[in-house]
Amino acid sequence: MKRILIALVRFYQRFISPVFPPSCRFELTCSNYMIQAIEKHGFKGVLMGLARILRCHPWSKTGKDPIPDHFSLKRNQEGE
């Protein structure tokens, strides 16, 4: 299951993302965050990635937002 989810994100990175200008507010891009979260937390990583995408908007804080060791939908405070 992990490989399928990661393949979907890689498809996005290769074919969809290049069409749009870079807009991620974080140092680890949202798509790379999603891949690493899936690798670390399985399907819960998808939820973490979606929560991260919802946090990525022009009015959010920028900077590092590393993947937490434990499942959480909140921004990792260690990254600030």
From Swiss-Prot:
Any GO CC annotation of this UniProt entry: plasma membrane
Membrane topology: Peripheral membrane protein
Subcellular location: Cell membrane
Keywords: Cell membrane, Membrane
InterPro entries: Membr_insert_effic_factor_YidD (IPR002696)
Superkingdom of this protein's organism: Bacteria
Any matching Pfam family: YidD
Key word Ligase present: no
Positions of the UniProt region annotated as Disordered: 61-80
Biased composition (Basic and acidic residues): 62-80
Signal sequence range: none
Primary role: Could be involved in insertion of integral membrane proteins into the membrane.
Family stated for the protein in its record: Belongs to the UPF0161 family.
Name of the protein: Putative membrane protein insertion efficiency factor
Organism from which the protein derives: Streptococcus pneumoniae (strain CGSP14)
